[in-house]
């Protein structure tokens, strides 16, 4: 599918049918999503595919988001790793000498952790939010490419998600992504004309 066509096909899907979503299709979409760029190639994301605990997770969603999560066959909870130094070292450890030069291994094992140690809390938060946005957009496009609907949800009680899903506190919840099929005819949302958002200097 051409990129323009793919973007035009992507819509916020808020009502889902009972048709199940194949776990293999979800895994494929996540695998494609992780090809997204990330600052320093830090890849600070974690995906939790929620099926059995979806009803519990839905209780944390605000307003109409409750209905969306409740009706979705699958919800993907996207987390980011707040221990950036540990994440950098994990990349070096898992990738190993087969994928990295000695210089690159040094970069992930020592250079990056030293840089991350200088970040204040706000810098870490901004860093994680940016990288979460990059991979989330890739994920919904990957789902769209397989004919699967999705919606990005920001409105939920982030303070309780780790407990409900039994996820280590070091991981920060960023988004809930509801996933499934729909029989609704979805219309594109209004977009500002491109000349309204471009300035030249």
Annotate each PLM feature.
Residues 1-201:
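Acidic, surface-exposed loops and disordered segments
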